[in-house]
From Swiss-Prot:
Keywords: Ribonucleoprotein, Ribosomal protein. The keyword ATP-binding does not apply. GO terms for biological process: translation. It comes from Geobacillus kaustophilus (strain HTA426). This is Large ribosomal subunit protein bL28. The keyword Ribosomal protein applies. HAMAP family: Ribosomal_bL28. One of its GO terms (cellular component) is ribosome. Belongs to the bacterial ribosomal protein bL28 family. GO terms for molecular function: structural constituent of ribosome. NCBIfam families: L28.
Amino acid sequence: MAKCFITGKKKSFGNSRSHAMNASRRTWKANLQKVRILVDGKPKRVWVSARALKSGKVKRV
């Protein structure tokens, strides 16, 4: 799984609980989008989290 270029977000781990409270491991995937942004003055296609895009931490090219 990819990682956010800006915030470093990646998938997180936890338990899925049944009605009987039995635990089985599961993952939550980060909402990552592949976008073109300027990196060192050049356009580059990277994975960026939706939160970073919405908050304006990056500017699309």
